[in-house]
Amino acid sequence: MAYMCTDSGNLMAIAQQVIKQKQQQEQQQQQHHQDHQIFGINPLSLNPWPNTSLGFGLSGSAFPDPFQVTGGGDSNDPGFPFPNLDHHHATTTGGGFRLSDFGGGTGGGEFESDEWMETLISGGDSVADGPDCDTWHDNPDYVIYGPDPFDTYPSRLSVQPSDLNRVIDTSSPLPPPTLWPPSSPLSIPPLTHESPTKEDPETNDSEDDDFDLEPPLLKAIYDCARISDSDPNEASKTLLQIRESVSELGDPTERVAFYFTEALSNRLSPNSPATSSSSSSTEDLILSYKTLNDACPYSKFAHLTANQAILEATEKSNKIHIVDFGIVQGIQWPALLQALATRTSGKPTQIRVSGIPAPSLGESPEPSLIATGNRLRDFAKVLDLNFDFIPILTPIHLLNGSSFRVDPDEVLAVNFMLQLYKLLDETPTIVDTALRLAKSLNPRVVTLGEYEVSLNRVGFANRVKNALQFYSAVFESLEPNLGRDSEERVRVERELFGRRISGLIGPEKTGIHRERMEEKEQWRVLMENAGFESVKLSNYAVSQAKILLWNYNYSNLYSIVESKPGFISLAWNDLPLLTLSSWR
């Protein structure tokens, strides 16, 4: 369903249309359920291609949204608080994205991200198995919180094979890495050896003795972290006492305390055996992401908002080139392709995606990039789009302007979706190099998505404090749709968040990458130092993000928060967790 209006006074008509469609969806779901009962159909037998005429990746009625709004309401329902729909973008770009493009609708011919994941489930062993292709660790496409692996959905582990085996074809040889001579000289702005940031907030390694985090259980963990280096014996004794009050099956506070206690214990006793599993199957990881994606709006918010910025920046362009830093499975792009295929100004004559593999793909990313390119090409073919996917196999630290083919008549977009934080270190040199490379390509728009928490330029105790606040909100946000007795929730928390918590406060070992994240203010400094200026997201993009929360009937504790110069954050209980921005 398209949320678009030709004049700002039509919001009530939109609301009426929404209510009417939802009533129709309820009737369809009831009939669908009756059919299952009559014919003995197993609703958990997943068939990604319910309507063969639609091709793969296009949703039919067999995939109703598990969290769609129920109940009706009259036409005077005041609960549609989106007065800022941007008339320009609604009429020029075709209204942006349909919420169904992100799994919120059941109409035929629309991209369903869950189907995309389910196709990976059926054919995942052809893409991402093996020790050299750890696709799901630190995966920006499949993980909204911590790109660590997760494990869930026992009832769906037995899935039927699908036609994805013909889509993911790793038998075709990978073309050798191509170095394209740039159409015009591309020079990367030189790195300066002076202070890498302007207005750089001062790093404060002193610990906050007045930390007042509630409840007391989390304060006790923070106090333990403060003395973990100076008095490890006392810290260990304190952890033993804390263990009596924590549980991975308790309330959100008890659960987050459980994982922090485990991580601190491992830090104090690095030779002790790990208490959680060290590996998960590819299928489990995909299913776990699906659980998180169904229950929480993080992935949908990030992709929807970034794609809208790209759609608006390229609204009249015939040739579009997207450079994606850190692509894995490409889940972000089908919805954008569908929006481009249906825009009112007509289809682009050419769309190209240059995919730079995420570090999580390991030293041999070729099979995953081939599979991603095949899926996207076949999806674009269904939409009758002239599409090409170019794998960029050069390591990110060796990339330069000649690594990309940039035609002079192309409009270029650069996408950093939950990727740059992986390049953070004690100094911002690597991040600065990547940003200056992006700037040298002269993009029309750069989209940046990052987690909203400071875990980099702070001392250990403050890192624990910030992480406690962040993950307390994350664990609470799972509760509305993943209940206290949910096995799926336990596995997502253990395999995803537990691993990430361990990575940010666990043992300091050589060769282990420390989890580092930064808040939006530091990203602003880094972007501006590289020569970018902020582009405020349109009123339509902001309203669309709010509609996303409303459409899926997520908890009212989720909110969209705007901040200067052009940031938009998804928050839980007023605490920003994930921030998107647009630059040029």
UniProtKB/Swiss-Prot annotation:
Start and end residues of each stretch annotated as Leucine repeat II (LRII): 371-403
Region (Disordered): 166-213
Biased composition (Pro residues): 173-188
Pfam families per the UniProt record, alphabetical: GRAS
PANTHER family assigned: OSJNBA0084A10.13 PROTEIN-RELATED (PTHR31636)
Role: Probable transcription factor involved in plant development.
Designated name of the protein: Scarecrow-like protein 4
